[in-house]
Structure formats: C-alpha cells, structure tokens
C-alpha cells in the first residue's frame, strides 16, 4: 500500500512538473514611466506657434531618450483649455489672453497626442477641475 501511494505521488509530481513547462509565459507588468508637462510655468506664453511646437517636440525626444513611455499633459490650467472646446475658453497660458484662439490656429492637445503616439508614448490629459485663477501673470 505504501509503495502504491509513493508511486501515485511520484506520478503526480512528474505530471505537474511536465505541465508547468507548458504554461504560457508571464510577462512583467509594463512600467508607467511618465513625465508631466505643465502649461502654467510660462513655457507657452508669447512664443510663436512653430517655435512652441519645436520646443514640445524637443522635450518629447529628450524624454523618450530617457526612457519615458507616458506623458501627462496639462490641458486645463484654470477653467480654460489648451484644446478646441465648445465649453471652455482658450487658455491665457497659450495665447496671453483668455478666450483668444491661437494664431495661427492649432490644437495643442491634438498635436501632443499625435507626437506622443509617433514615439510609442501614452498620452494622458491632465485637468485642474477646480482652479479658476492663479496669481501668475
């Protein structure tokens, strides 16, 4: 009886060992290595559209080289928007005047989505839902 039990246990262990070799490979969870690009630090205001686009592209290239795989981009700094919106005015941090559309016209959020995806980066829109005004000039 003991020999029979021992043989059954050995057969079971052998079966489990063989079955374990055929399990699908488990991949580690992908790391979220993000950088935050904010609008309220003044990097947008007063800069011509093409220069601003080049600055953003340069930032994205540097961040990609550093291993960043996601961008968190501030799209609503103060109850306004850095994207075309039916509800919110254009941000003063983009044009210098709240409610004034960029000239020449462009949509910073759309631009950033396209540029992030060209680099295989995730894009995350960050909003300030409650901030109405800051003391920044």
Predicted regions and their residues:
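Aromatic- and acidic-residue-enriched segments that line the glycan-binding/catalytic groove
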Residues: 81-96, 131-137
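Catalytic domains of carbohydrate-active enzymes, especially glycoside hydrolases
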Residues: 54-81
């Amino acid at each position: 009886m003991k020999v029979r039990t021992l043989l059954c246990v050995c057969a079971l262990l052998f079966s489990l060992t063989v079955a374990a070799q055929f399990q699908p490979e488990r991949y580690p969870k992908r790391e979220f290595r993000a950088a935050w690009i904010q609008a309220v630090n003044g990097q947008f205001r007063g800069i011509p559209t093409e220069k601003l686009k080049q600055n953003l592209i340069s930032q994205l290239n540097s961040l990609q080289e550093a291993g960043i795989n996601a961008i968190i981009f501030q799209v609503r700094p103060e109850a306004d928007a850095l994207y075309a919106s039916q509800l919110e005015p254009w941000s003063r941090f983009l044009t210098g005047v709240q409610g004034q559309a960029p000239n020449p016209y462009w949509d910073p959020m759309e631009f950033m989505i396209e540029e992030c995806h060209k680099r295989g980066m995730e894009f995350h829109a960050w909003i300030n839902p409650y901030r109405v005004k800051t003391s920044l000039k």
